[in-house]
């Protein structure tokens, strides 16, 4: 007979696999709040000739680009989710050509077929520590509002690597002022999925002019007594694709992550 912990873990894995099956069938939705307790990941796939530059870029910028898995050229499987297909199991993909957004698709199979040497990187995502935040009584506003997390380009440039350069992208969650320390402590125990915030308070210090106009995702309400808290974001690689004019890349659409079979506790330290 399974223990309650084993039963809960099995239910969480089932939820992750069910979510991937929905996305494979064409359902498009932000993944925040889906399969609670399971690790989520950002995705970027680039031609093999750009893979070393990106691996070095991620190594030099681990806060926004914590690598969870690297998938060899041409493969679309990952050890983070047995039987998953990275071409179909993310709800929405972005296609980039010469650093510009060329379109969005819900099935990227044809893109892999047309570019058989794609090397894929899975990058840690802050959605992973949202369940612990909620369990501590800290509301995650975009989940409560049923929308995507707001994300912003900043004026903080990242350390370049090879042909890649670009600015930091951050996600924002409003937190009651008296719970900010708790949010910092909780998220800080998850360094492989961005860890503690990079900034608390005045968005102008990051070069963000208007919180009501995010560059990616949706705006959320900020209630009296709350302060904006900013975390490094796995959309940072997409900013590098844009700034560097990468000839071809496939990424997840912001807020539409790959849900793994790995419990978030795996990345808790």
Curated annotation (Swiss-Prot):
Coiled coil: none annotated. It comes from the Bacteria. One of its GO terms (molecular function) is lyase activity. Keywords: Lyase. Its EC number is 4.2.1.-. Pfam families: D-Glu_cyclase. The keyword Lyase applies. Signal peptide: none annotated. Belongs to the D-glutamate cyclase family. NCBIfam families: PRK05463.1. This is Putative hydro-lyase Aave_3512.
């Amino acid at each position: 007979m399974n223990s309650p912990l084993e039963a809960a873990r099995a239910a969480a894995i089932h939820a992750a696999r069910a979510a991937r099956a929905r996305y494979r069938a064409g359902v498009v939705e932000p993944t925040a709040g889906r399969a609670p307790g399971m690790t989520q990941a950002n995705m970027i796939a680039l031609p093999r000739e750009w893979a070393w530059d990106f691996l070095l870029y991620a190594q030099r910028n681990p806060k926004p680009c914590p690598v969870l898995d690297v998938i060899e050229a041409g493969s679309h499987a990952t050890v983070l989710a047995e039987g998953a297909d990275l071409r179909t199991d993310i709800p929405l993909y972005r296609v980039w050509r010469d650093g510009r957004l060329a379109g969005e698709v819900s099935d990227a199979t044809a893109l892999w077929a047309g570019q058989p040497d794609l090397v894929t990187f899975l990058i840690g995502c802050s959605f992973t520590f949202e369940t612990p935040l909620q369990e501590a009584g800290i509301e995650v506003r975009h989940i409560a509002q049923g929308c995507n997390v707001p994300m912003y380009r900043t004026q903080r440039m990242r350390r370049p690597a090879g042909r890649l350069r670009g600015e930091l992208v951050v996600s924002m969650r409003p937190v009651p002022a008296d719970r900010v320390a708790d949010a910092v402590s909780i998220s800080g125990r998850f360094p492989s999925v961005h860890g503690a915030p990079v900034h608390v308070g005045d968005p102008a210090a990051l070069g963000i002019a208007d919180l009501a106009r995010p560059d990616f995702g949706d705006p959320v309400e900020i209630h009296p007594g709350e302060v904006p808290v900013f975390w490094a974001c796995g959309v940072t690689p997409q900013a590098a694709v844009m700034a560097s004019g990468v000839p071809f890349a496939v990424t997840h659409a912001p807020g539409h992550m790959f849900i793994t079979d790995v419990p978030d506790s795996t990345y808790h330290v």
